[in-house]
Amino acid sequence: MTVIDEIYSSSSAIPTVALNDEAKKPVLGLGVAKLSDEETESSVLAALEAGCRLIDTAASYGNEAAVGRAIAASGIPREELFVTTKLGTSRQGFHSAQESCKESLDRLGLDYLDLYLIHWPAPTLGKYVESFEGMIEARERGHVRSIGVSNFTEDLLATVIEETNEVPAVNQVELHPRLNQAELRQVHAQHDVTTQSYSPLGVGRLIEEPTVTTIAAEYGRTPAQVLVRWNLQLDNVVVSRSSKPERVAENLDVFDFTLEPEHMEAIEGLHDGTRVLHDPMTFMGT
């Protein structure tokens, strides 16, 4: 039984984990990539109504303002929420990272971010280290409480740590049964970096995988719920996305069952290194 499992067994509410800076972060949340403003607002409201308190957006998604409107409409106190957004590649740099952070706050209608991430390392641009240093400054100024990275490999993460003497709180990466990121997760554990997974369903490609559907039938759950639960039992924070409010609530309803070790291993056996989204070493982002 994992540490997170022990927490799950006591409550159906979404638990939190402590980041390396002692901030508390919900282990499951809503992502809003590629959602229109209307879809974003309805999905965020549905998630908040279902008990979700982690909302993950990005400047490049173009829907930060919609996230902010939904948060305002919900009436939920700010201190109960954990809001993440990300620095776009076009704004990388020491000063521009700080400016972009404030611009995101303005669009969200918030006074501070809970977590600010470098969205893509864009290593050929060569600005990810100074960007992270700019985010450290933004944190010092109270604009953000925790800082981290997204789509960073083991080597890129090591470079940030070595050159800034700061360990990112989070590395958010594509992670699902086809790409389980086992080696990267080991590095994260060594440095006390929280692994946050996106695309836990493999962009929908895994919900019809026979291994997953068979296990889902045994538990009386949907394949999506099984995939999210598998990811959580690896001690990852997970963000999932849907434009349908009923699916949003369904994907959050995963805290009243536990996958048995043999089922975890069967799903683990699907790993073949397939990446369904961008290669972080070559993709530049926006």
UniProtKB/Swiss-Prot annotation:
Keywords: NADP, Oxidoreductase. InterPro entries: AKR, Aldo/ket_reductase_CS, NADP_OxRdtase_dom, NADP_OxRdtase_dom_sf. NADPH binds at L201, V203, V239, R241, S242, R247, N251. The active site is at Y61. GO terms for molecular function: aldo-keto reductase (NADPH) activity. Pfam families: Aldo_ket_red. The keyword Transmembrane helix does not apply. It is an enzyme of class 1 (oxidoreductase). Its EC number is 1.1.1.-. Belongs to the aldo/keto reductase family. This is Aldo-keto reductase MAP_4149. It comes from Mycolicibacterium paratuberculosis (strain ATCC BAA-968 / K-10) (Mycobacterium paratuberculosis). The lineage of its organism: Bacteria, Bacillati, Actinomycetota, Actinomycetes, Mycobacteriales.
